[in-house]
Structures are given as C-alpha cells and as structure tokens.
Amino acid sequence: MTAGTVVITGGILATVILLCIIAVLCYCRLQYYCCKKSGTEVADEEEEREHDLPTHPRGPTCNACSSQALDGRGSLAPLTSEPCSQPCGVAASHCTTCSPYSSPFYIRTADMVPNGGGGERLSFAPTYYKEGGPPSLKLAAPQSYPVTWPGSGREAFTNPRAISTDV
C-alpha cells in the first residue's frame, strides 16, 4: 500500500466512525424528545383521551403505547391492537414490549436511574478496617542465610559463550 492509499483509507474509516457516532447521538435525542411530554401537552391529551378513548386504570402510557394513526375511514385509531400490560412513563416503570426504554442508546433522566443520577455520594469502607485505619502488620525480623556455591561460578557454567553474546 502506498502512503496515499493509507491516508485515504484512514480518512474514510474516520468518516464512517464519526457518522456512526452522530447517528447514535441523533437517535438518542430523538428518543428523548419523542418521549418527553410537557405539562400542557399532558393536560391536552388527557382531555382528548376522556372524550375519545377509554382511560387505562394502570397509569400513564408512553408515546409508543398511545400513538395513533389514520385508518381507512379517516379517523384516528391506535397503532397497537392491545394496550400495554404494564404502566409506562418517565417516572414510573416502563413496558419493554412497546417502548424504546429498553434500548441501550436511550438517555435515562436522573429520576430513572438509581442514586438519582449521581447526585448523592455513597461512601465505601471495607468491613475489616477499624476506625483507626488499616491494621498494622507485624512482620518477623529478616534472617540472613549464607549463600554457598558447590564450586566457583565458572564451574557452574560449562560453556562461556552461552552466557555473553556479541551485540
């Protein structure tokens, strides 16, 4: 490979990686804005739901569960034939069958994750430490043992060329 081919291949690879990152970020933002409801939208939807559809006693539904489309006659009909079996919503537990909350790319808000999104600090101390810190180690005094060779150092190695080599 020539240097130009390597540069072009690296540029294409970097472009593909950046496009993948941008696509994942756009998907996350899309999921965030599609499932987020403001207070006025919730009130308007509740009024419409009272007039049009029966309410579910299980709790609020997510956008994936309550989404509607035009049917052949021009009226709104729910996209799913059966409602969620679990309550949906940002603060409540979510149904995994019809909502994108189970996606690994979904951005969870602070009220959806344990520990409040990291706002509360948790301390950790091992149970074997006492309040004074780690226990002191009691070591025996080192002993010296005489090192003896059965002969001189030259006798232990029979081939002197195997020990040192030219560089």
UniProtKB/Swiss-Prot annotation:
Looking up Pfam families in the UniProt record yields:
FAM163
Q: What is known about the tissue distribution of this protein?
A: Highly expressed in neuroblastoma compared to other tissues, suggesting that it may be used as a marker for metastasis in bone marrow.
Alphabetical UniProt keywords: Membrane, Transmembrane, Transmembrane helix
Q: Where in the cell is it found?
A: Membrane
Q: How does it sit in the membrane?
A: Single-pass membrane protein
Which GO CC terms are listed, alphabetically? membrane
Q: What is this protein called?
A: Protein FAM163A
Native species: Homo sapiens (Human)
Task: List the gene name.
Answer: FAM163A
